[in-house]
Amino acid sequence: MIIESIKIHNYKIFQNAEADHIPNMAVFLGKNGTGKTTFFDVFGFLHDCLEKNVNSALSKRGGYKEVISRGHNGEDISFVIKFRPSHNEPLITYELSIGLDENNRAVVKNEVVRLRRGEKGAPWIVLRFSCGVGVAAEGELKQYDDVRLAERKEQTLESPDILAIKGLGQFKDFVAISAFRKLVEDWYVSDFRIDAARERKEAEYGEHLSRTGENLSVVTKYIHENHPEIFQEIVKKMKQRVPGV
């Protein structure tokens, strides 16, 4: 899963921001209050939207008025994410806009998934929804050609605050959407704590670091036993950067 760019509009401090040509590993630096945590919370917000709905995600952050950029009440919060499931696969664009209806309840104003194969030609619209109603590719969708050949039919979601990529069952096995859903569902922000990382938990098992890093010794043991060449490379780089290792 490779995210190439992300646009953010009216999400807290980011009234209009874009990160383009994002590498596989990126470092974001800035003073306190410049939006580093808010930038990563975008994925936390999408995670909560996908797990439940947009009203739940907004409520978790104090409601629409606390999330919308200052001075832009009544406008929509929107995101545009461009990604590829892998290097050689088509570029997928996911667009999401969230706003208030006539009852001041948050709804999905616009949700679009489209993909492009090659540099020329119009993109294929996978789905396009607004306020719970829209059109989507119909049938058994697994490969890209399945979407290209599929008939588009109008459909209605259970609620206008639910994401279509969650509410439409035909997309659960489609590689483009399943990869994006997995990224969003598995997303979390680590808060690495050095005191917790010093703890030793020999009896546990872990392949990945936890959010606070308290299982560092367990993951280190796993790498040492299962990937010795990677472990030696880590030690080599530590010796270059940390005196006395």
For each feature predicted by the language model, list its residue ranges.
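Pre-Walker A-like glycine/lysine-rich segment at the N-terminus of P-loop NTPase domains
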Residues: M1-S78
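Short beta-strand segments that buttress and anchor functional surface loops
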Residues: F79-S86
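Short, charged low-complexity intrinsically disordered segments located at boundaries
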Residues: S69-F79, S210-V219
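Generic marker of residues within folded, mature protein domains
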Residues: H9-Y11, S69-G71, S86, Q155, ...
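Hydrophobic/aromatic pocket-lining and membrane-interface residues
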Residues: L46, I81, L96
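Short linear sequence motifs
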Residues: E4-K7, N32-G33, T38, A57, ...
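Electropositive, glycine-dotted interaction segments
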Residues: N88-K236, Q240-R241
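Short acidic amphipathic segments
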Residues: G244-V245
